[in-house]
Each structure stands twice: as C-alpha cells, then as structure tokens.
C-alpha cells in the first residue's frame, strides 16, 4: 500500500464540496446564461439553451428558488436578468422579485428556448443570448460550474468575465480505498472542520423544511421518531432529516445546501446520514469529522467512475454507500467490515434508476440512507453480500468499476427511455 499525501485528498474534498441554492441542474443553466449575458454586456432579448439529456431530465420538473415556478425556462430567464452577488451554484441565493418578474416576461413572451441534444458529455449546457445584431455564448461541460468556453459574436474569449474559474483536482482513481481512508486518519480536526460546517448547513435546510416547508414525507417520518430503539434511532432520524432537506430543496425553497460532486442530494445524504449516526452514538467530534470525510470521499470516488450524472440514482448508490462506510467507522468496525457494508449497499441498490429531480427523490434518498445505516450495523454481525455475488466483485474498487460500466454502456438505453417517459407527462 502506497502512502498518499493527505493534501491531495483534502483538495479533492474542498473542490467537490460546495454551497448551492436549489437543484444544481437549473442552477447551472442559470449560471451559463449569466456568463453569456455578462459577455454580451446588455440585457438579452432572446435566450437559447441546449443541454444534454441528463440535464434536461433533472431540470424539467424541479422547483427554482425564489420563483414559485419549475423547470429550465425560468432558470434561463433568471440568468439573463439576475443581479445576484453570489457566485457559482449559489447564484439563486437571494433572487429579487423584480428579477423574477422580468424573467417571467421573457418566458411568457417566447424569448426563452430550451432544447436537449445528444452530447459527448452527460453534463453539458450551451447558453446563447442575443440582442440586436450581437450574440454571446457560454458552455458548461463535465462539471456544474466548469465554464469551458465563452464567446462574443462568434469569437471565443479566454475566460468568462466576472465568473470564478474552477480548478480541477487530482483524480482519486489512482488510489485504493484503503489508502484514501489511511490518509483521512492522518488529518487533523482543524483540517476537517469545514465538513462539520457543511453538515450544519444541510441540517438547517432540513429544519426549515420541517418547520415551514412543503415536506410531507419528512414531517411524517419525523413525527414517528418517538419510541424508536437505540439501534434504529439513527436510521429513523437520518431518514426524516434527509427527506425534509430533499423536499425543501426540490420544491424550490430558498435554503442553501452543501453539495458533493455537484449534487445537493448527495450532500444531504452524506452529511445528514453521518450526523444522525454520530449524534445517536454521542461520537466524539474528531470521530464525526473523519466519518464525514470517509462518507464524502466514497461519494466522490464512486462519481469518478460513474460520472457526475448517471442513469442510476446517484443519491441511493454513491452517497448511501458513503454513509454505510462512515457508519461502520463510527461503530468502531474494521476496514474489512466497512467494505462489507459498502458492497451490500451497492449489491442492493445499484439498479435504482434516476427519473429526474423532483420532490419524490426524497423517498429514494431517505430510504437508501436508512438502509445504508442498517447495513453498517449488519456488517458488524457478519451479515453482508459476499464477494462474487452479482455486481459485487472481489474488491470494492472493482465493484466501483462495475457501477461505472452499469451506468455506461449498461443503462444508456434505459436512460433514453426514461427521458421519453418524463417528457411525455
């Protein structure tokens, strides 16, 4: 086993963990249009956005914060007029009602066109904005905040004006999971405090949803917490918190969420699942922080194999696998028991399809996190899916590779069919 410089992993986590408001797919469309509009220099008269099928699938039915509306059209309209000082995927932090009114006018007057087309990247957005004889464009590819191209009147410029440029981190694929976990073990409390801060942001979103949001699942689950035994309390609490935060986010409540690998729902699952287990067990702060790091690292590692947007439900598979790993760590389990719990989650949930972003994601998300916590407990009792059974391979790294292959080419046709179903509502 080779030694990993912990700074490599810390840079990866800091890069992949970011603040967002609302679903990241319409948020990224808003960001792309905003970048193009800044380059144009005047308010656009017309907006044309072309997205990959996965972005379309995730953006068509989801709430957009501050608007009371759903979908990519209003997100694109906002990108043309918004004056938010927030950056990246937090662009919709404080949407001005006057901006919403102007965006609605653009949409209602037929000035916003959204199309989807097959692209080489599962995550692709091209925004084109027009005013008089001039036009500008911006392209986002592979990562939700990765603006790879901006141009004015057909001429490309080197970098987007007024937009932060995201730097890429070193891939984690060159390291085994054991090497990654060993690196986490060398990290200090001070180096990992940002993970606790991230978890608290997502907890506040859940609390806001439970208090005043359209969160029927979260509220129903939370009301049933009384009477749960110690062993099941963590799973029940995680289920309620993740459901409420997800419903709040997907309905368009204006609550910030810390995302992992570009997904707010991944961040909700990873952070709140671990937080629920640690608080139920009264785990020390350092133990909690390292469990959060383990959960986040597993999520990022899986997404490197399956890409940011997958045909299977990434929250149910990637994030919940991370929660299972962090749970076993908090319970004092061995590395072998951690891998057993992860294998069980993947072996059970790998085929769960993604059918777009919307409030019902809360059912998948909360159920998967609760199951992951249960599998964490079961692995310590020698109950787990054995290596060589189905998608579960002889090593956890190979199982991650299998997930990537299941996504592409395995589920490509299913993903296209799902888009047809969603578009036909």
UniProtKB/Swiss-Prot annotation:
<comment type="similarity">
    <text>Belongs to the UPF0597 family.</text>
</comment>
<dbReference type="InterPro" id="IPR005130">
    <property type="entry name" value="Ser_deHydtase-like_asu"/>
</dbReference>
<dbReference type="GO" id="GO:0080146">
    <property type="term" value="F:L-cysteine desulfhydrase activity"/>
</dbReference>
<dbReference type="Pfam" id="PF03313">
    <property type="entry name" value="SDH_alpha"/>
</dbReference>
<protein>
    <recommendedName>
        <fullName>UPF0597 protein UNCMA_16400</fullName>
    </recommendedName>
</protein>
<dbReference type="InterPro" id="IPR021144">
    <property type="entry name" value="UPF0597"/>
</dbReference>
<dbReference type="GO" id="GO:0019450">
    <property type="term" value="P:L-cysteine catabolic process to pyruvate"/>
</dbReference>
């Amino acid at each position: 086993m080779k030694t990993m410089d912990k700074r490599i992993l810390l840079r990866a986590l800091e890069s992949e963990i970011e603040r967002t408001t609302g679903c990241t797919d319409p948020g990224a469309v808003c960001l792309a249009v905003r970048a193009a509009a800044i380059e144009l220099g005047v308010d656009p008269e017309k907006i044309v956005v072309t997205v990959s099928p996965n972005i379309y699938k995730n953006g068509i039915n989801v709430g957009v914060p501050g608007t009371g509306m759903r979908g990519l059209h209003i997100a694109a309209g906002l990108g043309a007029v918004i004056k938010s000082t927030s950056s990246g995927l937090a662009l919709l932090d404080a949407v001005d009602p006057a901006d919403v009114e102007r965006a609605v006018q653009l949409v209602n007057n037929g000035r916003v066109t959204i199309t989807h087309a097959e692209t080489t990247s599962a995550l692709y957005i091209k925004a084109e904005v027009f005013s008089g004889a001039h036009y500008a464009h911006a392209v986002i590819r592979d990562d939700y905040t990765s603006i790879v191209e901006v141009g004015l009147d057909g001429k490309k410029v080197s970098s987007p004006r007024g937009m932060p440029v995201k730097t890429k981190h070193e891939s984690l694929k060159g390291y085994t999971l054991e090497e990654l976990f060993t690196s986490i073990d060398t990290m200090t409390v001070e180096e990992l405090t940002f993970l606790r801060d991230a978890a608290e942001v997502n907890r506040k979103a859940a609390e806001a949803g439970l208090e005043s949001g359209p969160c029927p699942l979260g509220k129903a689950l939370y009301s049933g917490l009384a009477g749960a035994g110690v062993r099941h309390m963590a799973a029940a609490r995680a289920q309620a918190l993740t459901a409420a935060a997800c419903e709040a986010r997907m309905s368009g409540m204006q609550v910030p969420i810390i995302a992992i690998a570009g997904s707010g729902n991944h961040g909700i699952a990873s952070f709140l699942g671990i937080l629920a287990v640690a608080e139920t067990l009264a785990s020390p702060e350092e133990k909690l922080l390292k469990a959060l790091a383990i959960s986040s690292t597993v999520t990022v590692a899986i997404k490197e194999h399956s890409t940011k947007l997958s045909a299977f439900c990434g929250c149910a598979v990637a994030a919940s696998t991370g929660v299972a790993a962090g749970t076993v760590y908090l319970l004092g389990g061995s590395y072998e028991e951690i891998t057993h719990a992860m294998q069980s989650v993947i072996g059970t949930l790998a085929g769960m399809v993604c059918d777009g972003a919307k409030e019902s994601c809360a059912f998948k998300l909360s159920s998967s996190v609760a199951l992951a916590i249960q599998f964490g407990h079961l692995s310590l009792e020698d109950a787990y899916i054995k290596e060589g059974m189905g998608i579960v391979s002889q090593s956890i790294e190979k199982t991650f590779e299998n997930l990537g292959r299941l996504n592409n080419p395995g589920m490509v046709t299913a993903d296209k069919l799902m888009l047809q179903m969603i578009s036909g509502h």
